[in-house]
Amino acid sequence: MDHKKTSIRTTALAALVLGAVAAPAFSAPVDQATYNGFKIYKQQRCETCHGATGEGSAAFPNLLNSLKNLSKDQFKEVVLKGRNAMPPFEANKKVAEGIDDLYTYIKGRSDGTVPAGELEKPQ
């Protein structure tokens, strides 16, 4: 039996277990509307253009900044009707029916009340 390999495996396993226990949670509890909006953002792949946290890219708008200037009605019009490179989503049932929740999530990110990262499903 190779004690050196066994010792390394044991140490690696212990580090893995302790790391998992000591690792901070990367999710935050939120209300149902915010959680629904978060799920729509992820499932409808908004992050493809606007980034995982809504901060955009060189080619696509930073939604966090945009929501500092757009009203809820203006946001809904842009998402549902489209604008410039933004395609319209009014034919997308999930987006159209969940537009208020999507706004709630992105507005919360914009205002700093909703953290970046995964969100916990409300109890």
Curated annotation (Swiss-Prot):
Keywords recorded for this protein, A-Z: Electron transport, Heme, Iron, Metal-binding, Signal, Transport
Binding locations of heme c: C46, C49, H50, M86
GO MF assignments: electron transfer activity; heme binding; metal ion binding
Record PTM text: Binds 1 heme c group covalently per subunit.
Coiled coil: none
Alphabetized Pfam families for the sequence: Cytochrome_CBB3
Origin: domain of life: Bacteria
Signal peptide positions (record): 1-27
UniProt entry tagged with the keyword Transmembrane helix: no
Protein name as annotated: Cytochrome c-555
